[in-house]
Structures are given as C-alpha cells and as structure tokens.
Amino acid sequence: MDMMGLAGTSKHITFLLLCQLGASGPGDGCCVEKTSFPEGASGSPLGPRNLSCYRVSKTDYECSWQYDGPEDNVSHVLWCCFVPPNHTHTGQERCRYFSSGPDRTVQFWEQDGIPVLSKVNFWVESRLGNRTMKSQKISQYLYNWTKTTPPLGHIKVSQSHRQLRMDWNVSEEAGAEVQFRRRMPTTNWTLGDCGPQVNSGSGVLGDIRGSMSESCLCPSENMAQEIQIRRRRRLSSGAPGGPWSDWSMPVCVPPEVLPQAKIKFLVEPLNQGGRRRLTMQGQSPQLAVPEGCRGRPGAQVKKHLVLVRMLSCRCQAQTSKTVPLGKKLNLSGATYDLNVLAKTRFGRSTIQKWHLPAQELTETRALNVSVGGNMTSMQWAAQAPGTTYCLEWQPWFQHRNHTHCTLIVPEEEDPAKMVTHSWSSKPTLEQEECYRITVFASKNPKNPMLWATVLSSYYFGGNASRAGTPRHVSVRNQTGDSVSVEWTASQLSTCPGVLTQYVVRCEAEDGAWESEWLVPPTKTQVTLDGLRSRVMYKVQVRADTARLPGAWSHPQRFSFEVQISRLSIIFASLGSFASVLLVGSLGYIGLNRAAWHLCPPLPTPCGSTAVEFPGSQGKQAWQWCNPEDFPEVLYPRDALVVEMPGDRGDGTESPQAAPECALDTRRPLETQRQRQVQALSEARRLGLAREDCPRGDLAHVTLPLLLGGVTQGASVLDDLWRTHKTAEPGPPTLGQEA
C-alpha cells in the first residue's frame, strides 16, 4: 500500500489502519516498517514508567510497566523496534506493537518475530482520549535478561536468637540474589538484603525433593511482622542477570515475646471426695497484625492452652496434661503449677504462670505410723476396690526435692477395710523432725488430673516426748496470791496438729497442795493463783500429743513472797512528806506565838493608850527635835521640864541632866493623872504639842522620860494625845517650868 497516497492523514492513524489489514500474532501485535515516531518521553508526570522486558522461560518473554494517571478509558500499546537479522547491512529497523488495553503486562514468544539474541528497543504509549503519553525507551537483549520467580511454595519460618530464618525451595539453579521487605502494624515497609545464595553460610541448604533450597535471615521483633521475598538472577561475574522478581506472598510471623495473659483462676475448697473445682475466667490477649496479615494464618495465636502439672506424687507415670483454656477442672489437694500457653507457628509459648498450693482436708483422718529399727509402717482406711494409692512424705519446711513417694496397688482387699504399707529401707521416719504425709487415690493413675486426696496428716518422728519437752521455764510474781509461768514453745508446735495441749503442774514441796493447768498449744504462758506466801513451790510443764503424753520439764522452784505494790509505796511516801510538812508548819507557828509572848514588842507612844510614869520622878520632859515644824525661825533647842508638885518618895533626883523630867510613880494614880493633864495644858499654851504625829510613829518627836525604873501605863499617854489640840504656830518658849 502506498502510504504517500494518504495525504493529510495522521501517521499514527495510518499505521493503525495498516496494522488492521495485516496479520496479527498471539500478542495481538503488528509488524511494520519504521516511520518517524517520537523519540523522547512525553515529559508529563503522568503516563507509563519503569518499563521492563525479560525472559520468563525458555521460549516465553514478558514486558511490564507501571502507569500513573486515570484508569478509565486508557489503553496501552507496547512498541518494539529492531533490525531484522537479514537486514543488518542496510540498518533498516522494523517495529512491532502489542496492544494490551488497560493491562500493564504483555507476553510474547519467539514466534511473534521479536529477536531475542539481538538488541531490541521497547517503549510504551498510553492513549487517553486524544492524548498520547510515552515512556522512556529501553534497549534489551531478551535472551540473557531473565526474570526469576519469587518463592511460590511454602516458606518455612523458624526463630532462634532473636532472628527469623526463612527457607524455601527453588526449581532453577542457585545463584540468585534475594531481598526481603517487612512491615509491622505501626511501621511502613523496610527493605533488607539476604545476600547472594551460594554454597556457604546461610545459602543453599541442599537438595530437597530434587530441588534446591534458599534461605534468608531477618531480625525478630516484639510485634507481628509481614515479610515478603523477591529474587534476581545473578551472573557468574556478579553482575545482575535480570530484573527483580515479583514479591512473594506475605509471610506472617508472630512477635518474639507474646503479651501476657490476664486469666483469673477461682478455686473452691476441697469437697468430701478430696477434690476441688478450678474455674478460669478472662480472655486471651489479641495481637495487632499488619494489613497484609489480616485474615491470614501465621501472625495470630492459633489457640490457647493450659498446662496442668502436678508437683506432688512425682512417682506417677505422667505428671502433666494440657487442656483447652477455659475448661473447668477438678483437682486434688496436691500442689500444682498451671501455665497458660499460646500456640503459634513457632510452637507453644508461656504467657502466664499460676501456682496452686496444696490444700489439706478439713476433717482429721486417722493415720497410724509406727517406726521400729529400719522398718516403717503406715495404715489408713481403704477406698473402693481397684484404687491405686500414692503415698508421699517429706520433711516439713524443706524443699520438695526431699519428697519421697511410692505407688501402692493392693493385690487383695483387706477384710478390715484398711491399707497397710511397710518398707524396711531408708528413708525412715525415725529422725526427730516433722513430716508431712499425704495419701492420694485414683482409679486412673495415668491421668494426673484424676487423683483425689484421701488423707493428709503430720507426724513427728523419733522420740516426740523427749523432743517436745518445753525449755526455759520461768516464774514471775504477778499479784498478791498468783504468779505467771512462761516457757518457750515446744518443738512439737512446728508440726501442725501434733501438739494438742500443754500441762502445767504446780505443787508445794511439803506435799500439802498440788494442781495442774491445761493450756492450749498456741499459748506459752499461764497464771497460777491461790498460792500462799512463804511456801516453797515447784512448777513443771509438759507437751502432750494425741498419741501419748509428753515428758515433764526440769522443775522450777520458787518461794512466793507478798510484795507491796508500787502504788502503795508512792502513797506512803506522799503521806510521810505531807506529815513532815504539816508538823514543820505547826512547829513554826507555835514558836512564833511563844516568842511573841516571851518577848513582846516595845510600845509605841503614838499608838499606846496610856503611859505610866514612876511616882518617884517629879519631872516629865518632852523634846521635839524636828526643825521642819518651824521653817521661818530657828531657836536654840531646849527640853521642856515639867515639875510636879508633891512629896518625893526618896528625895533623890534622876541622874539625867537638867532638861530631863522625873515623875513620881509612888503617888496615887489619880494624882498622877491630874498632873499629866496640867502638864499637857501647859504644853498647849507653849505651842509645843503637835497633832501631826501619826499614832505609833515617834520618828519626829523625841520624848526622853526619866522613869526611874517604873513605867507608867500606856493609857495615860493615850489620854494626853486624845485631848491635844493643834495650836497656832509661833515661836516656842523654852525652859518654862510648870
């Protein structure tokens, strides 16, 4: 067809019309002579990109690309141009195109006329309406550029030392490069390199079912991961031999450390059958997984289990059993460990541990134990025929590693409905210590969850009477007729249920009195009352068991003395002090009164009511010595002399000087009073009397009296002062006689 005859027609449209007239290959392609087509990309951010063409098998080839832009009504065309082998001398290129519509992959083979041993130029055109977008052109030798396949089968994942190891089978020869990418629920994709797969290190493992195996290592995390693998052919020179393969299907792995569960275990007490019900409540934790692992196995926990391990009676055939989480259990009173397990692709992981301690029967059941020499025998009530028993004993307060147990299968039924077990080899129960003895029974001894507790008891081995004797008995006075007795706890008290009581015996050494007190095993003190003073007593203590009484302790002697309480001593001391204080106060007051009467105080002229002058004195003199009474004029000081008329008794004068006055006290009292009144009148006339002298105060007036050995009554002087009147101030008259 002459293309020049289609003048004015678009070359692309003309080319498409020609291809419609030609034959089409399997890839819906058309081969034409090269015309002038655009050589560069469209330059737009939209359109096809990352074109890659490669060989996928011996005869099959493929080209793929990516596209950015609207997906509706878009069509893609793959162009491939080459020089035919028989036109190498002319250099004339021929082109072929493959229309893929909206798909971004084109497959073809050698029969489509594409040379695979020579260079071929490829590009993609994407048409959207009247717009055409073109990719970058690539040149490729198809036969040597091979794209490998990703791991298509099962990828085995294992975990060790905080690393994940992935292994898979490949059908072609080894020699590929391997990469991985991973992401977690909170992170984006992270690219990692597995390195070349060679016959060393973590490379080829060997032939598995006629194929080769490859492996890759990547870090393990505490979160769920999504991992994908891709491969690329690697030449012997180390250069890449093809593009990267597609990513494999997601490989989902759980976290290395699973979150802890919060399961609550509820345990009921032992029932009459020797079993207790265990109920589990709560939900197992849910894991967060990446987007590609939602709904896919691998990252999630497959199931949750509970591992029940019976720590008691380890001589049984099987000591543990696994049950689903949430199942109600009926367990014996033995000690158990319960582990909550999470089953993942890596196996079982413990996410919670719980310890169930042993529980004893509420009622006491008889256990007969006898030890003689190297022979130890035990006897207890039998259960139903065909029952297997597990006898366990261990020293109390010791590690469980010292536990001894034995399985007992009675051959024939005892008429007395008793089970007897004896052994003559060690260990025996002859040491002086506490033993815990438990008997379990089961119809199915191979299942550790079907045992029941039929007997639990404690036994103190050796000579319990001697070992249980209380030590360090002491006696202390308490009240007037009682004492307190104390002692250290018996060694039997460390063995639950063995010590039944203490017995305290007190007796007088003269044999006149004796009594005993029963004390509970939890107490180590008792008060003894009803005792007498000044009597020698002795007290002893013993510890009794249910089987036999204990041995008496060493006697403790004491003499009961009446003691005075401290409060009485305090009151007596206070009374003595008060008595001394009272006697001292009374004595002081009595001495003061006696001194007052024996040595009265001197009379005060201003305060007395009378002054008696001796009758033998004929004169009476007063002297005022205070100059403040006469501030204007100062006169020579002289004494006032008053001469009393009358006869003198003895005719003698007082040995005082002339200004002094002597009064005759031998005259009658009335005569003396008259004379005193006259003397007072004379003193008033002279202005020598003062009313400003306070009563009882002689600080401003000096009145020397010539008494001659006889003192007048205080009433006379008092009358003188009472009749005194204040005179007008004036110059005093000295030396005037009455």
From Swiss-Prot:
CDD domains: FN3 (cd00063). Residues 592-738 are cytoplasmic. It comes from Mus musculus. This is Interleukin-12 receptor subunit beta-1. Belongs to the type I cytokine receptor family. Type 2 subfamily. Keywords: Disulfide bond, Glycoprotein, Membrane, Receptor, Repeat, Signal, Transmembrane, Transmembrane helix. It is found in: Membrane. The keyword Disulfide bond applies.
